[in-house]
């Protein structure tokens, strides 16, 4: 009778089954990655003064700025609004990816995408 080469995994451990499950999970992750890359998230800051649209690949698709917040005497405020909006958009994409990965894998994989 052959000994189990992986103690602690029980006698019913099947490396082929594990490889099959790993391939299936990899396929599901790749499919999810493509789907997430197509999704877009819109975020605003300053009460809607600045809006950013970002996709799942963290590519900025558009930035909209209300004309009334463009003040040549106060460029710093506009810069702060844009930075805050872009950073929030990135955080939302990261959260979306993590939540969707948990659905597929049963656990999060930070920084996967």
From Swiss-Prot:
Its main location: cytoplasm. SUPFAM superfamilies: YbaB-like. One of its GO terms (cellular component) is cytosol. InterPro entries: YbaB-like_sf, YbaB/EbfC. It is found in: Cytoplasm, Nucleoid. It comes from the Bacteria. Keywords: Cytoplasm, DNA-binding. GO terms for molecular function: DNA binding. NCBIfam families: DNA_YbaB_EbfC. Belongs to the YbaB/EbfC family. Homodimer. Binds to DNA and alters its conformation. May be involved in regulation of gene expression, nucleoid organization and DNA protection. This is Nucleoid-associated protein Athe_1143. It comes from Caldicellulosiruptor bescii (strain ATCC BAA-1888 / DSM 6725 / KCTC 15123 / Z-1320) (Anaerocellum thermophilum).
């Amino acid at each position: 009778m052959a000994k189990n080469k992986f103690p602690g995994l029980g006698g019913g451990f099947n490396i082929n089954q594990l490889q099959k499950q790993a391939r299936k999970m990899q396929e599901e992750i790749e499919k999810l990655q493509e789907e997430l890359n197509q999704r877009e998230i819109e975020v605003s800051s300053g009460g809607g003064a600045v809006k950013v649209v970002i996709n799942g690949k963290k590519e900025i698709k558009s930035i909209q700025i209300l004309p009334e917040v463009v003040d040549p005497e106060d460029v710093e405020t506009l810069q702060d609004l844009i930075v805050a909006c872009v950073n929030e958009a990135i955080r939302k994409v990261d959260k979306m990816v993590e939540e969707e990965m948990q659905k597929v894998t049963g656990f999060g994989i930070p920084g996967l995408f």
